[in-house]
Amino acid sequence: VNPDQTIRGNCIKFVQDMCELTSKLEAPNTYLRPGSINTNGPWLPHPENHTDKVFDRLVNSTKEIITVAENEGVMLSLEGGYVSPIFSAKRAKEFIDAVGSKNLGFNQDPVNFISSIEQAYNTREFLEEFFTLLGNHTLGAHLKDFTIIDTLLLRFEEEYIGSGMMDQAYFLKRMNEICPDAHILVEHIPRDKFEPSYHKTIEYSNAAGIKWESYK
């Protein structure tokens, strides 16, 4: 989404190359991350990130990438987050429709999109919008959690699985219903916290009636 054509062109070429590598590795898909106008990092806020101008630029960039993905037989898995140009379930659906390719899907990562008290305290309703609008496009998911920090100004932080506010059993249940063959990545867990997070994931999976396939 960078307005500098040289920088944007280099990024487009990088993702095109990733499509070719993904095909050679016979991997299921590769991520498409929207970026940011903020020069300090791709997952940081900027006043223009939610504008139609940046959205249209992202659509145009993706159309250049998607032809390579189609030729290579590779799926692109769209990521997003509230601070990014893909800031809601509705915006993600609008983006997928605008690009108009069967090779563009969606990675369910709802924690990235939490942006209000109402969403934080009603995560089932929040999750359901993503599954309703993007269920048919879902390729996989990231599993993590969040909490609200006790402070005057609204602030969210990631939390270890099992200690946060997301209804994980409902999330896994709906993932299993809409995309039973999905891969789900437990994300942003330090090594010393991985084992308890794993056990919590299994606990939520049992509550959701999910049996995981063995990885080979």
Where are the language model's segments positioned?
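Active-site acidic/histidine proton-transfer and metal-coordination neighborhood
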Residues: 1-105
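Histidine-acidic metal/acid-base catalytic patches
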Residues: 28, 59, 63, 71, ...
